[in-house]
Amino acid sequence: MRAVAVSAFGEQPQLMDLPQPEPGPGEVLVRLAAAGLNPVDWKLADGMFGDAVQAAFPLVMGTDGAGEVVAVGPGVRRFTVGDPVFGQFQRPERGGGSYCELAVADENSLAPAARSVTYATSAAVPTAGMTAYNLVEETRIGEGRRVLIVGATGGVGTFATQLAAGRGAEVIATARPAKAELMRTLGAAETVDHTAGPVADQVLAAHPDGVDVLIDMASGPEEFIELTRTVRDGGTAVSLIGSADADVLTEHNLRGFNFVNRPSPQLLDILAGHLDAGRLTVLVGREVPLEEAPEELAASRTGRAQGKTVLAI
């Protein structure tokens, strides 16, 4: 089968011809129609997680995907052959990923795909969508809460903006002027141009009483602490990239933490329901053939990628 893989950590991804995997107990084999590209894909392939990840090579890249079940292993109860599914396929210890024609996944890493959208749309959802949903849950966002989302125009940010607004929160999203109207259509009450000056100063000028929740997907430790000036006494500040210092936040009487995602099939079911109900918009910036994955990964590494990239398989 065709697959985009690396032969060792740090090697360049290449289109390879690899053997078809076979499902074991509790596993399903999926013929993938599309795979979603996430920054974590190239970070894993580059070996950025160190000893925390044990991998077999060649390592097929990719986590997110969508397609049709073509075989099931012993003991599988949730799916049968022919079912449309979406979810997470990255299994580095077995060299498995989603940038390929056929992939094996644990049945509990998948859910029935939404019926009202394409496989390409479904493939763009799992990692970013579950991250955003868990963020909104863990920061207790609800009716009347004011939320500042930094890095709002990315995959997680656009989902978090929609989910928070859908719960009745007042969302302030960072966005360049060219993306401001888009963010408002996704539910942001207002936007802040992070290129026009310190975000904290702009937010406090408009809202001297601050925000209830800060969700930051982009700032380093110093910038993150600066942004916590916007958070009201007793509020919540969360970093997605490990910038939160719990001791410092406690000194400022803030609840805060470095977010760790907890994926589950139940979350995938919820997201599929949102898609079918029209409550979640998925912004696919580019859809390209599988063989162009190396170029798209290079663009993602440099930050040149625009919108969510999906690989058509």
Predicted feature locations:
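C-terminal hydrophobic helical "lid"/dimerization subdomain
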Residues: 1, 268-313
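Glycine-rich beta-strand-centered segment in the early N-terminal region that forms part
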Residues: 19-37, 49-91
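NAD(P)H dinucleotide-binding glycine-rich loop of Rossmann-like/cofactor-binding domains
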Residues: 54, 78, 88-151
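Mid-domain Rossmann-like dinucleotide-binding core that forms the NAD(H)/NADP(H) cofactor-binding site
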Residues: 123-196
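Glycine-rich helix-loop-beta junction characteristic of Rossmann-like nucleotide cofactor-binding loops
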Residues: 137-141, 206-208, 229
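Short amphipathic alpha-helix with an adjacent loop that forms part of the alpha/beta core around
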Residues: 198-209
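Glycine-rich phosphate-binding loop and adjacent beta-alpha segment
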Residues: 218-280, 313
